[in-house]
């Protein structure tokens, strides 16, 4: 997200600002149940999230649809990447938002452990049971209680490429990880570096690792590592780092080499492939690449910007890594009724369809008609996410305590940047990751 899904585009451009939405007239009956559709009139719902730029603009349309439906005014506050710190300071200052769009499972769990959250309503729970794969309920729950509704998801197992670059090199979308590296070297030989890697943003490197690890080590090991039930010094981690290091150490594969990758942020990596002066043929990241290629560089998705699924590594299965933003209700918010009604609204395909029509969005809600998405590529990625069901695995770094998996210049982000700079010793990197993880989990458990 975040960060990331997601959140990724928004986190890369995050600005701290607060926008107000003007109240609209009463509309149909509120999703809160009963009444004349105006029972929330006079209330102002404050929603905090990481989004800015195009993502914030599109989410505002969802807020406006809620206003039209219920009469409640809305106000969005952008937190930037440090959601936990910003929300904590607002709670301490007596100015807590009513709803927070949380981009990390670890942060949601942290909020619940601190007793900041309200359990979701029965109506929302019923919608989740009916219309979401069980994995999404699991990621939104703490100790069996549902606190988070996943409204926006990301398919983070997509590799985006320039069809022109592939045509020039005479290569096709690869079916395996080894084929992807071979195709990349062929693209490089044709005159254009293979991959634009956004090494300046450490979260993109965690996504690279997670796809390799899920495919190579398998979902059981992935779950164990995500929960720190095995150590980062496990041989499976070292092997995944070795696999990733083969890419990071190959100057034919990285636009600008390791130094260039470390100086490239996420928006810059997309620009290197789809901008006016291409510097690479491929960029790995989630489906949200499409929104940026379209909005920022005017590319026709499916024609001038295409993707292939992140290919399987060795004998493993193709990975499906996801991320997402979960809506939670804060106990200290001043408008509990409006907050609960808003989450009931977000649980409907009606709410998801508002953003789906704008692009840069996927919903884990199975009840959303795929025809709501604005183009065939989005429909394809959305179907892949839904069809994966419980084989989807949530972004591992987002499940970790923020000190390890979600802090710029620290923990996993920094250590994988160090590994990109020098990938010669995977075992040493694994040991450093374990030391940082052990410290972060110990602190989180004490808290």
Question: What are these regions, as identified by a protein language model?
Answer:
Residues 65-132, 167-175, 272-274, 281-282, ...:
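Extracytoplasmic "Venus flytrap"/periplasmic binding protein-like
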Residues 105-157, 181, 306:
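Hinge/lid segment of periplasmic solute-binding proteins
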């Amino acid at each position: 997200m975040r960060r990331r899904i997601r959140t990724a585009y928004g986190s890369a451009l995050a600005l701290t600002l607060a926008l107000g939405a003007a109240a609209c007239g009463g509309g149909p009956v509120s999703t809160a149940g009963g009444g004349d559709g105006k029972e929330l009139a006079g209330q102002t719902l404050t929603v905090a999230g990481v989004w800015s730029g195009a993502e914030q603009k599109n989410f505002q349309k969802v807020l406006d649809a809620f206003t039209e439906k219920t009469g409640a005014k809305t106000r969005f506050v952008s937190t930037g990447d440090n959601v936990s710190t910003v929300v904590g300071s607002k709670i301490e200052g007596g100015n807590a938002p009513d709803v927070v769009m949380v981009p990390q499972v670890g942060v949601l769990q942290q909020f619940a452990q601190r007793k900041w959250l309200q359990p979701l309503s029965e109506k929302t729970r019923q919608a989740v049971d009916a219309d979401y794969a069980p994995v999404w309920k699991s990621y939104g729950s703490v100790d069996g209680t549902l606190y988070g509704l996943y409204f926006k998801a990301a398919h983070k197992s997509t590799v985006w490429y320039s069809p022109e670059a592939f045509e020039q090199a005479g290569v096709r979308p690869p079916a395996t990880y080894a084929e992807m590296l071979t195709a990349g070297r062929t693209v490089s030989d044709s005159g254009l570096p293979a991959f634009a890697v956004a090494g300046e943003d450490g979260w993109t490197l965690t996504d690279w690792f997670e796809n390799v690890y899920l495919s190579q080590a398998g979902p059981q090991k992935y779950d164990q590592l995500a929960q720190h039930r095995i150590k980062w010094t496990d041989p499976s981690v070292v092997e995944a780092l070795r696999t990733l290091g083969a890419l990071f150490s190959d100057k034919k594969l990285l636009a600008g080499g390791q130094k260039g990758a470390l100086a490239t942020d996420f928006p810059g990596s997309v620009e290197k492939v789809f901008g006016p002066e291409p510097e690479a043929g491929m960029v790995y990241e989630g489906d949200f690449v499409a929104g940026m290629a379209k909005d920022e560089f005017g590319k026709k998705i499916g024609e001038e910007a295409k993707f292939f699924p992140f290919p399987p590594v060795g004998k493993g299965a193709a990975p499906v890594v996801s991320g997402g933003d979960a809506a939670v209700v804060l106990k200290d918010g001043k408008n509990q009724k409006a907050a609960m009604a808003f989450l009931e609204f977000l649980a409907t395909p009606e709410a998801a369809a508002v953003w789906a029509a704008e692009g840069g969005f996927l919903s884990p809600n199975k009840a959303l008609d795929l025809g709501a998405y604005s183009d065939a590529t989005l429909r394809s990625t959305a179907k892949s996410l839904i069809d994966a069901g419980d084989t989807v695995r949530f972004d591992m770094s987002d499940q970790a305590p923020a000190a390890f998996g979600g802090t710029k210049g620290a923990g996993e982000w920094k250590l994988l940047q160090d590994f990109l700079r020098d990938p010669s010793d995977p075992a040493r990197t694994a040991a450093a990751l374990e030391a940082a993880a052990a410290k972060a989990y110990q602190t989180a458990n004490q808290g």
